[in-house]
């Protein structure tokens, strides 16, 4: 009884508050309320894409290192290696700290809603002093209880609607909302077409500044260009001979060199050495072979001695001499390894700092990742895989390390996106190589990549088929590279 009485009082109060108006005024009031009241959106929704439940085996592959001398078959101590492996074995579910957790697929992009505004009716002017805020009114009015009536009446879109009138205007309210609120499918199509046809930042002939981070001292932004020029000059002085196999070595051939390097890759994986150690080891071997004839029985001794020097130069905790003796199944004694180490150091005149393809690759990967659409880790790991394959090929010594690194970036980008030109003005500026200058080296690396699965030197390929390297060695590669990619005018 009391509630119905309060409702009637509220209705009469609202009727008194609304100024007298004709039929046209009533329609205007109903129109204003129709524009103000929110109607639930019926079927306008976005459906999230189904989550990708595929799981990956995160167990990493450990390269089996064999014992024995190089001449007898490249063996590694089985007892010691198995003990090291069993002690360092981790659960199969462990994920490398470099790996990112699997992410769900992104949801569908929301549709663009175009709301067409309609002309608001003329505001109703009422003196503010004659109104009191309706704290618990039964009318159909959307107003904050903390807002004073005087403030609300200042809005030209505000007007009271009685309960009796709300039922009569509900149908027109629905129609008005459907007319005013509509989804523009044409705009979606136009925006999608514009984004597809618009050139990406890498396709526009502009040079991106990659040395603009002056806060990180490790990037050396102010000295980066000078450091690069110094490395380019040093690589010519500390590069091995390109024909020592034909002119100097009589008992060693390129195939034996490749077998030695393939074995050293396994040793580096076994002792978890950094990549720079492997690249420096190969550099020391080739520089020593460029001026010293050696027989095949001492080739493995040269390899472990050079890796010992490189590990001392690059590693925080380098393996001991005894460990390198053990890894050869004690084919060589400790004194022999130290004697060969001294011979290498004296011949190289203790100039152990040498630019390798890995030095340039770090710089080039960072340049390639600027505004690039390729996944950062996939590009980095794929370029590293291609660069390590180049260590096995004796004929690639005819190219400087900077050119090999630039060609590895070129080929990695081509494998990830075969339809897109892999070179651009930014890479050409920072590498100082045009695409035409990379043609021969890229084709040689492409052949190495394509014959990788059938190679009898599987260490590098098996290394990069691990989950922590994103299985980049398993990526398919087109059988040929379009010739127009090597034309400078297309960059």
Swiss-Prot record:
Residues 75-91 have a biased composition (Polar residues). CDD domains: CYCLIN_AtCycA-like_rpt2, CYCLIN_AtCycA_like_rpt1. Keywords: Cell cycle, Cell division, Cyclin. SMART domains: CYCLIN (SM00385), Cyclin_C (SM01332). Residues 1-32, 69-106 are annotated as: Disordered. InterPro entries: Cyclin, Cyclin-like_dom, Cyclin-like_sf, Cyclin_A/B-like, Cyclin_C-dom, Cyclin_N, Cyclins_cyclin-box. Residues 1-21 have a biased composition (Low complexity). GO terms for molecular function: cyclin-dependent protein serine/threonine kinase regulator activity. The keyword Cell division applies. Signal peptide: none annotated. Pfam families: Cyclin_C, Cyclin_N. GO terms for cellular component: cyclin-dependent protein kinase holoenzyme complex; cytoplasm; nucleus. Belongs to the cyclin family. Cyclin AB subfamily. This is Cyclin-A1-3. The gene is CYCA1-3.
């Amino acid at each position: 009884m009391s509630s119905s009485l309060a409702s009637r009082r509220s209705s009469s109060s609202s009727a008194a508050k609304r100024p007298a108006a004709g039929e046209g005024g009533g329609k205007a009031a109903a129109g204003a309320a129709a524009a103000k009241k929110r109607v639930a959106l019926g079927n306008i929704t976005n459906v999230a894409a189904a989550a990708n439940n595929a799981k990956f085996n995160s167990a990493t592959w450990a390269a089996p290192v064999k014992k024995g001398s190089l001449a007898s078959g490249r063996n590694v101590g089985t007892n010691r290696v198995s003990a090291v492996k069993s002690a360092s074995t981790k659960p199969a579910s462990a994920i490398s700290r470099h790996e990112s957790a699997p992410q769900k697929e992104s949801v569908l992009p929301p549709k663009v809603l175009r709301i067409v505004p309609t002309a608001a009716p003329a505001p109703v002017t009422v003196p503010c002093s004659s109104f009191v805020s309706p704290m618990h009114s039964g009318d159909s009015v959307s107003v904050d209880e903390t807002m004073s009536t005087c403030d609300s009446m200042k809005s030209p879109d505000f007007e009271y609607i009685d309960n009796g009138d709300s039922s009569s205007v509900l149908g027109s309210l629905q129609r008005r909302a459907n007319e005013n609120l509509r989804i523009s499918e044409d705009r979606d199509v136009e925006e999608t077409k514009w984004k597809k046809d618009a050139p990406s930042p890498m396709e526009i002939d502009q040079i991106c500044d990659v040395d603009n981070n002056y806060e990180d001292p490790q990037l050396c932004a102010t000295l980066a260009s000078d450091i690069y020029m110094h490395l380019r000059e040093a690589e010519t002085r500390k590069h091995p001979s390109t024909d020592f196999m034909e002119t100097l070595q009589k008992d060693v051939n390129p195939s034996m060199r490749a077998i030695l390097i393939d074995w050293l890759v396994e040793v580096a994986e076994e002792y978890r050495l950094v990549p720079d150690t492997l690249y420096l080891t190969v550099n020391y071997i080739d520089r020593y072979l460029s001026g010293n004839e050696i027989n095949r029985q001492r080739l493995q001794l040269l390899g472990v001695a050079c890796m010992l020097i490189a590990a001392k130069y690059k590693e925080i905790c380098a393996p001991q001499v005894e460990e390198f003796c053990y890894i050869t199944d004690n084919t060589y004694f400790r004194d022999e390894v130290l004697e060969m180490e001294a011979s290498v150091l004296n011949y190289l005149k203790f100039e152990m700092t040498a630019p390798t393809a890995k030095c340039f690759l770090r710089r080039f990967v960072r340049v390639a990742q600027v505004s690039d659409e390729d996944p950062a880790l996939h590009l980095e790991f794929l370029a590293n895989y291609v660069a390590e394959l180049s260590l096995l090929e004796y004929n690639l010594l005819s190219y400087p390390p900077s050119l090999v690194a630039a060609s590895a970036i070129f080929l990695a980008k081509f494998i990830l996106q075969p339809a897109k030109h892999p070179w651009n003005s930014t890479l050409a500026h920072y590498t100082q190589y045009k695409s035409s200058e990379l043609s021969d080296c890229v084709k040689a690396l492409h052949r190495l990549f394509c014959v990788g699965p059938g190679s009898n030197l599987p260490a590098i390929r098996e290394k990069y088929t691990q989950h922590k390297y994103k299985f980049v060695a398993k990526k398919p590669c087109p059988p040929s590279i379009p010739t127009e990619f090597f034309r400078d005018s297309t960059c």
